């Protein structure tokens, strides 16, 4: 498009965006979404070089090519490529992939090319490619693969190119390549191969390229076969050299003589190798079948361990779960140690099949429940350590297969009871540890006391925790009769054998039936133990801010409803609802959610109701509701949503109700799809409305025309991801620096995966609470701020934090639990603060601390700080810088070197030191003020009413502030709590005279009157027909003194008031109006009409007579006035002005003699006025005035190649210009013109621009157009409507086009300032009357002019009569049609006969067979018409009454634009192309093109692009043999 460089750019972008929106809507459902940051084109998805750490979600299912190369992906899981059944090419090269789960490629049935080179693969899992039968090229080069297992390539028989070079391969198992019968290229160079079995290449008949060079080939007798094999194939395997023995090193394998391939000693079989035995995880060490991974920071169980391992050590890592079958394949395992991790979830089959396992160590984790069957089959187990966990229940059959168990430790757990029979299978048990459990010693634990007395194997001293009478007593020493049950205890423990201990209601919650109500309890997180029977979980009105992925819902199989309304939820972590497959209703109303992602609702597969009302959501993206196919009701009411991404609701296939109200929708091009979706989907939506742009405000989205959803080119969708770095900071990978930025709070937009955060040199007064959400932090620098106090558990969530810098702040106090949870902290800097004391136990959790900086603090070294001195000396964690400041005897002594016995307490401690941790101890609040601690100001005083100031020391006169309301008088009173009292005026009461008592509580109002409260009184508001102070007096409006009816009207009393019946000639509520009967007078020859009651009189000019002055004078008198010979037209009156005749024109006419008709009234249904096109030039100015009270209609229409129209649309003026070379453009007036008053409308065409001006306001421009509008062509210009034969086919807009004509007045039409005369109206201008008098004759119909001064009425359905005032009678009632259907035609009807009958009443039977037998159709088929007459329906290419004439083969030229679809854009030729269509008959041949030529045409697309394509054009038609 050749457009201007300035303002036109925005217009072009708007048109292109609109075109794209139209194309996407018209083409059906929106295409699948593209993953974030990736680029999607047709069936290709490009995500290369984006720094991705995992395969992105949301890959389109129709993708055929996927580029994920040059990222940081480390693992390929089973779900990464699930469902991509059309994928043919997959690029994963140049990543960090070290693990590929088995089954990762199971859905890739069409995969042909796979690149995995330049990764970190060490092990190639067997059967990895068995589900990719069409794979032809596989690149595994430049990895760390150590061996090729026998089943590595099972199932990929079609592979032609396999690249394994530049790995660490030392073992190729026998038969590894057996399936590769079509292999042509195999690269094994640059590996560690020393031996190759003789059968390795036997099944490769098509091999043409083999690379074996740069290996460690040992040329002994076992490799002699390879020499013969290579000599027979000289073109492959070149440069394959021996590396051993020494005397053959460097020789070509093919050139060494067979006799030199010898083995020392007797010949034996080639030593076999095991590929799996070579694998060892990169972070671990492997030797003697023992894998040691201790303290390596692992977060999951390593995959691809050597198959023959007997022991694995995984203690002191960060593993959180043990997945299904984690150890199943390692059948020789004897010892597993996973102690001191973070394990909370164990799959039931994690240890399945380990029959050789003798030792299992799981202590020091977070296990709460042992899954059913976890230890089944472990028949050799002798040692099982489960101590230091959180186990609260054990099923009775937990240890059923552990007959050989010697030692079982359940020490330090949460067990309250143990089911009888739990230890029965333990036939070999020798030692049992049960201490440090909160045992409830009731009747259900009686068996344990008996068991321990009979089997003294419990050596840890297990004791009772409750009831109080048995508390702290050893279970083995209590007599069995002491174990008794109350009713509640019996209910609680009845089902403990099946782990139904959770029948106990969680603390702070209320349980009734299956409802667990934990609402309004100030909970910060979901309780960790909930009853398994829970169906309805109520957590509303709490303080929950983050929904963690704790797996809690996996333990609640019966859960159906979750209420989380009215919390503070800002984030829902991925996997938070895992296990909630049965939940049908989720309430998240009244929270602080700002963004949503598709993974936050994962697991809610059965959800039917989702309430997200009253949050802060600003955008709904197309993956937000992925997987929620069962949702029927979705509420997004009262959020901040401005845009919704196309396809956002596509996955909600069951949706029937959606509430989108009270959202600030911006109806730009990003929202175009929603209006169409709302119209197409018949669901309850609440009819959401636009709020922007201004001209669409409060208009329902589904009512907005598609072309009105526009963008100005600068707008972005609010669904775009916010920047991953705060605006005030700089970010490099996961390091964020916000130093010296003057910050008072933590900046927004902090990346969730931040590991190092620098906030030094700002104005922070406290440690930001938001830091607890960033759990990956390893370093925080908060130095040089103004932090004065820490709170307990400030850093408890930061388990990875290793460095914490708090130096040079204003810290005065360290709470005892301030550093709880910092078990990984190595460096703590508190240098340069105001700390005097550190409470004992403050550093209990700092088990990894190696450096403590406490220098430049005024330490008070008395006995309370002795512990710190000992602690520092024990590990030399403080470098000898911290010095004591007080007491005087310890001043300037080093904390590290001063002997411990010198830390003594002598006398009271200075109050200023003690008050550092509690400023209120110094009693700063005076005059009985209440002191409370403040983290910023140290303390805050709440003053009594008569004092103010920081310390409540400033007295105030309470009466000065006039606390008494409503004119009450204030009196000072020291005896009262507030220091004053009020004397209230009459009618008020209360301490401050703030209460106006309701005097209507006891009122005397009668006759259902309404009492209105006053001040110390009330008033009665009377119903109609009643009056009086108490509404007890009846009003008769029709008595003479009350009658308001005028002009002798009759007054009629009603229940509520009265009614006046007017005499003829008067109207109005009180008959006060004398009707103007002159409105439709018939006075002629300029007679004056004088209104009378119910009539009028014509005062005739001199010489005229008759009732209507219709009779002219009998003779022409001598001229006595200048008007005598001056003829005024159109009923105008001649008057003399300054001795000159002047015509006073009636409304609607102008000119010296009123000869021009300048105002017309459009009253008909299809009325219009046609103006000749010669009056319009290419550069023109068209102006007119309009008056109407209608919302829609056509004002002006010019139809040609580039049609334009001026229309009324919803009360505004709309200008539409449609050029085939670009999308239609539209502009609206700001002003509305449907108020019945005259408004000026002006259209200016100049220099390829179209401008609209309404009421002399600011012009609205369509901008620079591609070419000058072709308004100067020969097509006519229509006003007020268009002929029905023309229609609006030239315009390409949709169903919102106002096809109806204009109803109202058009006045003073000027074209290029030339006033147009409507007097010579063409014949078709019916329904157009001169002047601006509205037609009110037709009661139930439309007026249509038939002559200059008369109209006829076109009645609406159901009405008839000359004035459409008579209800129509159905003419088909009692019809006489015998064998047919009655069809109404106005006041009559006709009969539509059934087949085989004819006649006016369908009473004559036709013999169709005989009728057609005498009527021959040569090239067609005979049919019988409705009248019973035969006729011929001709075959193509024939015509005539009997189809006897063959049409000659001819070419017919049709001019139209050729269209193409390019991706998502619609493209068309820039101009119309002449196309020849061949039609006609050719006997036995066919009418076809016989001459054609190809020509290049430019196609312009709606996305702004263009291209050139050759198009074949037919030039001549003729008869040719049919093909």
From Swiss-Prot:
Gene Ontology BP annotations: animal organ morphogenesis; aortic valve morphogenesis; apoptotic process involved in luteolysis; atrioventricular valve morphogenesis; axon extension involved in axon guidance; axon guidance; cellular response to hormone stimulus; negative chemotaxis
Residue ranges of LRR repeats: 62-83, 86-107, 110-131, 134-155, 158-179, 182-203, 308-329, 332-353, 356-377, 380-401, 404-425, 533-554, 558-579, 582-603, 606-627, 630-651, 753-774, 776-797, 800-821, 824-845
Any one Gene Ontology cellular component term annotated for this protein: extracellular space
The keyword Hydrolase is annotated on this UniProt entry: no
Pfam families: EGF, hEGF, Laminin_G_2, LRR_8, LRRCT, LRRNT
Highest taxon, organism lineage: Eukaryota
Domain EGF-like, first and last residues per copy: 918-953, 955-994, 996-1032, 1034-1072, 1074-1110, 1119-1155, 1340-1365, 1368-1403, 1408-1444
Signal peptide positions on this chain: 1-33
Disulfide bond residue pairs: 284-293, 441-464, 443-485, 505-511, 509-518, 667-690, 669-711, 920-931, 925-941, 943-952, 959-970, 964-982, 984-993, 1000-1011, 1005-1020, 1022-1031, 1038-1051, 1045-1060, 1062-1071, 1078-1089, 1083-1098, 1100-1109, 1123-1134, 1128-1143, 1145-1154, 1305-1332, 1355-1364, 1372-1382, 1377-1391, 1393-1402, 1412-1422, 1417-1432, 1434-1443, 1449-1487, 1467-1501, 1478-1517, 1482-1519
InterPro entries: ConA-like_dom_sf (IPR013320), Cys-rich_flank_reg_C (IPR000483), Cys_knot_C (IPR006207), EGF-like_Ca-bd_dom (IPR001881), EGF-like_CS (IPR013032), EGF-like_dom (IPR000742), EGF-type_Asp/Asn_hydroxyl_site (IPR000152), EGF_Ca-bd_CS (IPR018097)
Annotated GO MF terms: calcium ion binding; Roundabout binding; signaling receptor binding
Protein name, per record: Slit homolog 3 protein
């Amino acid at each position: 498009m050749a457009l201007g460089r300035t303002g036109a750019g925005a217009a072009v972008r708007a048109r292109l965006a609109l075109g794209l929106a139209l194309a996407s809507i018209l083409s059906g459902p929106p295409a699948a979404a593209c993953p974030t940051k990736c680029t999607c084109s047709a069936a290709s998805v490009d995500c290369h070089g984006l720094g991705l750490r995992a395969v992105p979600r949301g890959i389109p299912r129709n993708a055929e090519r996927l580029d994920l190369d040059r990222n940081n992906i480390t693992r390929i899981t089973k779900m990464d490529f699930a469902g991509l059944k059309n994928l043919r090419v997959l690029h994963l090269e140049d990543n960090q992939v070290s693990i590929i789960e088995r089954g990762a490629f199971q859905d890739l049935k069409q995969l042909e090319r796979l690149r995995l080179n330049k990764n970190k693969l060490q092990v190639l899992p067997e059967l990895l490619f068995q589900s990719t039968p069409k794979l032809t090229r596989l690149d595994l080069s430049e990895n760390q693969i150590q061996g090729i297992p026998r089943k590595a390539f099972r199932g990929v028989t079609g592979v032609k190119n396999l690249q394994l070079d530049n790995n660490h391969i030392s073992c190729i198992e026998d038969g590894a390549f057996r399936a590769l019968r079509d292999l042509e290229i195999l690269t094994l160079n640059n590996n560690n191969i020393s031996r190759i079995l003789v059968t390795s290449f036997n099944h490769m008949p098509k091999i043409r390229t083999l690379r074996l060079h740069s290996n460690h080939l040992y040329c002994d007798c076992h490799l002699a076969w390879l020499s013969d094999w290579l000599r027979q194939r000289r073109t492959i395997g070149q440069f394959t050299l021996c590396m051993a023995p020494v005397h053959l090193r460097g020789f070509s394998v093919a050139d060494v003589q067979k006799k030199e391939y010898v083995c020392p000693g007797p010949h034996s079989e080639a030593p076999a190798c095991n590929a799996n035995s070579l694998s060892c995880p990169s972070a671990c060490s492997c030797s003697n079948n023992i894998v040691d991974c201790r303290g390596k920071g692992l977060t999951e169980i390593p995959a691809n361990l050597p198959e023959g391992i007997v022991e694995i050590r995984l203690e002191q890592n960060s593993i959180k779960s043990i997945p299904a079958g984690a150890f199943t394949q390692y059948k020789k395992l004897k010892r597993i140690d996973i102690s001191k991790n973070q394990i909370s979830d164990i799959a039931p089959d994690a240890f399945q099949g380990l029959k050789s396992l003798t030792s299992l160590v799981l202590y020091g984790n977070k296990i709460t429940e042992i899954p059913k069957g976890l230890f089944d089959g472990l028949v050799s187990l002798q040692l099982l350590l489960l101590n230091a966990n959180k186990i609260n229940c054990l099923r009775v059959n937990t240890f059923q297969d552990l007959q050989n168990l010697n030692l079982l430790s359940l020490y330090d757990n949460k067990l309250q009871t143990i089911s009888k029979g739990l230890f029965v299978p333990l036939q070999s048990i020798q030692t049992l540890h049960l201490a440090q459990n909160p045992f409830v010693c009731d009747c259900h634990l009686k068996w344990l006391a008996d068991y321990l007395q009979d089997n003294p194997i419990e050596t840890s001293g297990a004791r009772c925790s409750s009831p109080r009478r048995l508390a702290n007593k050893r279970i083995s020493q209590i007599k069995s009769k002491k174990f008794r049950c109350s009713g509640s205890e019996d209910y609680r423990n009845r089902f403990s054998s099946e782990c139904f201990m959770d029948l106990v209601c969680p603390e702070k919650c209320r349980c009734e039936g299956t409802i667990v109500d934990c609402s309004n309890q100030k909970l910060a997180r979901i309780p960790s133990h909930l009853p398994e029977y829970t169906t309805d979980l109520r957590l509303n009105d709490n303080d929950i801010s983050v929904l963690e992925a704790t797996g809690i819902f996996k333990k609640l199989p019966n859960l159906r409803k979750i209420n989380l309304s009215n919390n503070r939820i800002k984030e829902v972590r991925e996997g938070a609802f895992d296990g909630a497959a049965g939940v049908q209703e989720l309430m998240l109303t009244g929270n602080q959610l700002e963004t949503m992602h598709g993974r936050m609702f994962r697991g809610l597969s059965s959800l039917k109701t989702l309430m997200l009302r009253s949050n802060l959501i600003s955008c709904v993206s197309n993956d937000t509701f992925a997987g929620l196919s069962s949702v029927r009701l979705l509420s997004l009411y009262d959020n901040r949503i401005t845009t919704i991404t196309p396809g956002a609701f596509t996955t909600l296939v069951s949706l029937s109700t959606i509430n989108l109200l009270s959202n600030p929708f911006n109806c730009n091009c990003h929202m175009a799809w929603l209006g169409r979706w709302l119209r197409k989907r018949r669901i309850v939506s609440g009819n959401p409305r636009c709020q922007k742009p201004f001209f669409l405000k409060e208009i329902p989205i589904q009512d907005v025309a598609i072309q009105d959803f526009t963008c100005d080119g600068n707008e972005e969708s609010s669904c775009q991801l916010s920047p991953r770095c705060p605006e005030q900071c700089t970010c490099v990978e996961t390091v964020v620096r916000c130093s010296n930025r003057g910050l008072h709070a933590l900046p927004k937009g902090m990346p969730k995966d931040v590991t190092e955060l620098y906030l030094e040199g700002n104005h922070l007064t406290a440690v930001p609470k938001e830091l607890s959400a960033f759990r990956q932090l390893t370093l925080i620098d908060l130095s040089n701020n103004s932090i004065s106090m820490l709170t307990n558990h400030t850093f408890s969530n930061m388990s990875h934090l290793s460095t914490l810098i708090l130096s040079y702040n204003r810290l005065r106090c360290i709470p005892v639990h301030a550093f709880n949870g910092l078990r990984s902290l190595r460096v703590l800097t508190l240098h340069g603060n105001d700390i005097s004391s550190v409470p004992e136990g403050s550093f209990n959790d700092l088990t990894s601390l190696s450096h403590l900086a406490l220098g430049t603090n005024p330490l008070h070294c008395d006995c309370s700080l002795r512990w710190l001195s000992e602690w520092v000396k024990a590990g030399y964690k403080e470098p000898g810088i911290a010095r004591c400041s007080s007491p005087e005897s310890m001043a300037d002594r080093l904390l590290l070197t001063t002997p411990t016995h010198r830390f003594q307490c002598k006398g009271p401690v200075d109050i200023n030191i003690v008050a550092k941790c509690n400023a209120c101890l110094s009693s700063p609040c005076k005059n009985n003020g209440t002191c409370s601690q403040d983290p910023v100001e140290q303390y805050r005083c709440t003053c009594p009413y008569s004092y103010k100031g920081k310390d409540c020391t400033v007295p105030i006169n309470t009466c000065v502030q006039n606390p008494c309301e409503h004119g009450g008088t204030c009196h000072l009173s020291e005896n009262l709590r507030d220091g004053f009292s009020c004397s209230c005026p009459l009618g008020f009461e209360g301490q401050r005279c703030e209460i106006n008592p309701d005097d209507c509580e006891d009122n005397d109002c009668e006759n259902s009157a309404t009492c209105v409260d006053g001040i110390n009184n009330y008033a009665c508001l009377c119903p109609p027909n009643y009056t009086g102070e108490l509404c007890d007096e009846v009003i008769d409006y029709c008595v003479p003194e009350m009658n308001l009816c005028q002009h002798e009207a009759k007054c009629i009393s009603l229940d509520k008031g009265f009614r006046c019946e007017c005499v003829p000639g008067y109207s109005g509520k009180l008959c006060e109006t004398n009707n103007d009967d002159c409105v439709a007078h018939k006075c002629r020859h300029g007679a004056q009409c004088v209104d009378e009651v119910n009539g009028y009189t014509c005062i005739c000019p001199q010489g005229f007579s008759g009732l209507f002055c219709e009779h002219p004078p009998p003779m022409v008198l001598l001229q006595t006035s200048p008007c005598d010979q001056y003829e005024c037209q159109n009923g105008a009156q001649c008057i003399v002005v300054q001795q000159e005749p002047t015509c006073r024109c009636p409304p609607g006419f102008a000119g010296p003699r009123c000869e021009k008709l300048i105002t017309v009234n459009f009253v008909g249904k299809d009325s219009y006025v046609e103006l000749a096109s010669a009056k319009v030039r290419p550069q023109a100015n068209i102006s007119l005035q309009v008056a109407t009270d209608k919302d829609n209609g056509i004002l002006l229409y010019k139809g040609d190649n580039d049609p334009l129209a001026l229309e009324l649309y919803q009360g505004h003026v709309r200008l539409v210009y449609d050029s085939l070379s670009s999308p239609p453009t539209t502009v609206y007036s700001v002003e509305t013109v449907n108020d019945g008053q005259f408004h000026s409308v002006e259209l200016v065409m100049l220099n390829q621009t179209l401008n609209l001006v309404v009421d002399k306001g600011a012009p609205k421009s369509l901008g620079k157009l591609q070419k000058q509008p072709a308004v100067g062509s020969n097509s006519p210009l229509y006003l007020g409507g268009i002929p029905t034969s023309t229609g609006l086919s030239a315009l390409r807009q949709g169903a919102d086009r106002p096809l109806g004509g204009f109803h109202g007045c058009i006045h003073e039409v000027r074209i290029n300032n030339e006033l147009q005369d409507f007097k010579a109206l063409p014949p078709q201008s019916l329904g157009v009357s001169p002047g601006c008098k509205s037609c009110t004759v037709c009661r139930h119909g439309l007026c249509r002019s038939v002559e200059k001064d008369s109209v006829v009425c076109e009645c609406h359905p159901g009405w008839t009569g000359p004035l459409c005032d008579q209800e129509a009678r159905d003419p088909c009632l009692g019809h006489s049609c015998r064998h047919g259907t009655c069809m109404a035609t106005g006041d009559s009807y006709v009969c539509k006969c059934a087949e085989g009958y004819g006649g006016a009443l369908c009473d004559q039977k036709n013999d169709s067979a005989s009728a057609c037998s005498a009527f021959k159709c040569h090239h067609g088929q005979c049919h019988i018409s409705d009248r019973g007459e035969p006729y011929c329906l001709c075959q193509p290419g024939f015509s005539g009454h009997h189809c006897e004439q063959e049409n000659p083969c001819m070419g017919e030229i049709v001019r139209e634009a050729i269209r193409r679809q390019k991706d998502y854009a619609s493209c068309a030729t820039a101009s119309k192309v002449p196309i020849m269509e061949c039609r006609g008959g050719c006997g036995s041949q066919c009418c076809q093109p016989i001459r054609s030529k190809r020509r290049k045409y430019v196609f312009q697309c709606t996305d702004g692009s263009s291209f050139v394509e050759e198009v074949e054009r037919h030039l001549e038609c003729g008869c040719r043999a049919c093909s």
